Amino acid sequence: LYLNYYSKSSEPTTILQRVEQLCLRVKECSEDYQLINQAVIMGAAAKLLQGQPSEVLEILGEEVTIQLGRDQLVATAHNMLGHTEEAKQILQVSMYQNMLFTIVTGTEGLLLEVANPTHFDETVERIKKLIEVFNVEALNVNAALTFYLKAATGYAMQNRKAETLEMLKRYTKTCIQIQFPLTLQGDDYFYLLTDWIKKEIDPQAPRDEQSIKKDLLASACLPAFQLLQEDKEYKALIQNLKHHLNRREVN
């Protein structure tokens, strides 16, 4: 909750330092390794938001860690014990999370490849296909929206107006389709995901509806899209988004 609202505080650094304190307490007092791992990641995120990248590397290390297939081992063990439903759920959740990690990681790398248009375009195409095939706009709309915005930003940096506009069209269309209150849940394919989300994660969005709507609109009006300021289609997109979010113009 602190991480989701720290930017709204008059003293954001104080809030982030509080996050660090809470994470340290979990690491010192908990015997649950999963909680400890989550605390380490959240503490590192708080440091990154404070502009402390060197400290983040000290906490997490500087290299990619090898994934040893823990989830597959646990699922196989459950199956050997006759716990078929548990095994299926673990594999579904693992597949869902790895699919999202692929999209999020690819999205994060986009702006690092702006000077390499061939690689940039290929990444965009591959992630677009993943989003479509895995129904990501319904499963985890934030992952899809973040990708569309990052892709649009990269295209704008390359001064490619048509491609920038296309990504913003996808962004706007997805925003308009959002059903509030925003929740996380599975679908017909990930049919065991919803129960896991209810057990392990709060399915409700961590921020209130009006804050989400305000940010959805503000994100479509970033300075990065200055090259479209006089474009009629872009102006129409923004007006349409304002209408569907039932918001007045954000100053």
Predicted feature residues:
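Generic helix N-cap/helix-start motif at coil->alpha-helix transitions
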Residues: 30-40, 63-73, 97-109, 140-148, ...
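Amphipathic alpha-helical repeat scaffolds
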Residues: 24, 41-45, 61, 72-76, ...
